[in-house]
């Protein structure tokens, strides 16, 4: 085993467990440092989103005889760094290796393993995860650069995801978790046009939500974020003539008192909107219906918020039914995408196998070239000394054959003694006898 992925996602684990194993930027750096210091792997890439946490590792020194030991060590490390119970983690954890690992990454980056089938947002998240690891290894070159194998896998993955987008219809509709959140709002309220909508956060997900809402003619839009400058930049990116109010999180209670809909997605490690804060807002609003869609992991809204009168509280996990419709629409395109991924992952794995033994192949060829040059030099010298040309050529061909087949013959004898029938069959097929 040289390449391993292990992780959890929305299919295998609840939002509560996903919160526990999410990587903040600080913890990501700590993880990359630990992985290298403990020699768990040569290099790694950590993908942490609302719906999944995955660690991709490469260790060329792990062979078939100790791959299970390595896997166990990786799982134990994963549990330790997040301080979660090992058995609880194992019940939700999946792992893949080599060909299956490369295929899994390509499926993830192409949106085939997302909550919404084919959603494009994940590709950007995979690229960002790769870039963060690449930057880490560049800044810490004393511990080594990212391995060629892992780098090649991610570059191949990006090209594959682009091919899937180009050659299939899987990305024609703009669907994402953000789109699902907006769809939910349109299902609960007849019209969004005259409602006050509060967005908490200013990241990529909130940007997508904003664009969906503006396309549906929303007039009362406000954005709350920890830093006003980032919220201002988001409004600039939206390039809209619609007035959008922005304010910092210390005025969140004021925003809640005006909001009919709250959609939140921040990177906060703690709850931002408590039940008490919502209750105060609802009292001021005379308990008019309020929809809260919390698409952050860890969650931004206190879990018991849905118990408040006239409050409709949804998390990422609650969006499943809305998303299922989109999945059904994209099944046909996904089959074509799976075929592309099967081709590309097999192509990468063939490269990986050759690359692993590239030094062996190169050394064998260099050795053969040295033998050829040595024997040729002796033959030319013999001809210059006036020896019979046919005899010199016969001797040259005989010695060249004998020396070149010496190592392969020894290898065959070793395989015979070891009972390695698969190796012998592969060898006989290669030399066609």
Swiss-Prot record:
SUPFAM superfamilies membership: Glutamyl tRNA-reductase catalytic, N-terminal domain, Glutamyl tRNA-reductase dimerization domain, NAD(P)-binding Rossmann-fold domains
Catalysis performed (reactions): (S)-4-amino-5-oxopentanoate + tRNA(Glu) + NADP(+) = L-glutamyl-tRNA(Glu) + NADPH + H(+)
Enzyme Commission number(s) of this protein: 1.2.1.70
Source superkingdom: Bacteria
Positions of the record's site feature: Important for activity: 104
Similarity field: Belongs to the glutamyl-tRNA reductase family.
Additional facts recorded: During catalysis, the active site Cys acts as a nucleophile attacking the alpha-carbonyl group of tRNA-bound glutamate with the formation of a thioester intermediate between enzyme and glutamate, and the concomitant release of tRNA(Glu). The thioester intermediate is finally reduced by direct hydride transfer from NADPH, to form the product GSA.
A Pfam family hit: GlutR_N
Subunit structure of this chain's protein: Homodimer.
Domain notes: Possesses an unusual extended V-shaped dimeric structure with each monomer consisting of three distinct domains arranged along a curved 'spinal' alpha-helix. The N-terminal catalytic domain specifically recognizes the glutamate moiety of the substrate. The second domain is the NADPH-binding domain, and the third C-terminal domain is responsible for dimerization.
Binding-site residues, substrate: 49-52, 114, 119-121, 125
Any one GO molecular function term: NADP binding
Active site: 50 (nucleophile)
Pathway: Porphyrin-containing compound metabolism; protoporphyrin-IX biosynthesis; 5-aminolevulinate from L-glutamyl-tRNA(Glu): step 1/2
Keyword Oxidoreductase on entry: yes
Signal peptide (UniProt feature, chain positions): none
Protein residues bound to NADP(+): 201-206
Organismal lineage: Bacteria, Pseudomonadati, Pseudomonadota, Gammaproteobacteria, Pasteurellales
Protein name, UniProt field: Glutamyl-tRNA reductase
Gene3D superfamilies, per database record: Glutamyl-tRNA reductase, N-terminal domain, NAD(P)-binding Rossmann-like Domain
Gene Ontology BP, a term: protoporphyrinogen IX biosynthetic process from glutamate
Known function: Catalyzes the NADPH-dependent reduction of glutamyl-tRNA(Glu) to glutamate 1-semialdehyde (GSA).
Disulfide bond among keywords: no
Main EC class the enzyme belongs to: oxidoreductase
Key words, A-Z: NADP, Oxidoreductase, Porphyrin biosynthesis
């Amino acid at each position: 085993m040289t390449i391993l992925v292990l992780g959890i996602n929305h299919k295998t684990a609840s939002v509560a467990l996903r919160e526990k194993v999410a990587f903040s930027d600080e913890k990501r750096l700590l993880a990359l440092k630990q992985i290298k210091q403990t020699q768990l792997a040569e290099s790694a890439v950590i993908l942490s989103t609302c719906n999944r946490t995955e660690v991709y590792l490469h260790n060329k020194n792990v062979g078939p005889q100790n791959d299970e030991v390595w896997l166990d060590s990786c799982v134990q490390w994963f549990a330790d760094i997040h301080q979660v119970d090992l058995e609880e983690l194992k019940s939700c954890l999946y792992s893949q290796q080599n060909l299956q690992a490369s295929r899994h990454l390509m499926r993830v980056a192409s949106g085939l393993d997302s909550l919404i089938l084919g959603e494009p947002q994940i590709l950007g998240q995979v690229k960002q995860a790769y870039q963060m690891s690449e930057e880490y290894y560049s800044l810490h070159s004393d511990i080594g650069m990212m391995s060629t194998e892992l780098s090649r896998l991610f570059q191949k993955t990006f090209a594959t995801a682009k091919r899937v987008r180009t050659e299939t219809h899987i990305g024609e509709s703009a669907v994402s978790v953000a789109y699902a959140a907006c769809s939910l709002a349109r299902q609960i309220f007849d019209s969004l046009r005259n409602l006050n909508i509060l967005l908490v956060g200013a990241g990529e997900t909130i940007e997508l939500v904003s664009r969906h809402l503006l396309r549906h003619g929303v007039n009362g839009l406000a954005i709350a974020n920890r830093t006003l400058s980032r919220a201002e930049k988001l409004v600039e990116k939206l390039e809209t003539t619609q007035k959008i109010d922005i304010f910092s999180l210390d005025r969140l209670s004021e925003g809640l008192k005006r909001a009919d809909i709250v959609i939140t997605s921040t990177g906060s490690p703690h709850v931002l909107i408590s039940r008490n804060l919502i209750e105060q807002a609802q009292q001021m609003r005379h308990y008019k219906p309020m929809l809260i869609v919390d698409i952050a992991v860890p969650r931004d809204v206190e879990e018991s918020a849905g118990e408040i009168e006239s409050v409709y509280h949804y998390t990422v996990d609650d969006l499943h039914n809305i998303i299922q419709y989109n999945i059904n629409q994209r099944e046909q395109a996904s089959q074509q995408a799976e075929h592309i991924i099967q081709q590309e992952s097999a192509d990468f794995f063939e490269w990986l196998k050759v690359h692993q033994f590239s030094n062996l192949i190169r050394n064998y060829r260099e050795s053969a070239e040295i033998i050829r040059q040595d024997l040729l030099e002796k033959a030319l010298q013999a001809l210059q000394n006036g020896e019979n040309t046919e005899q010199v050529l016969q001797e040259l061909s005989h010695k060249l054959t004998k020396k070149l087949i010496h190592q392969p013959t020894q290898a065959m004898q070793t395989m015979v003694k070891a009972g390695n029938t698969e190796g012998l069959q592969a060898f006989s097929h290669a030399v066609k006898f």
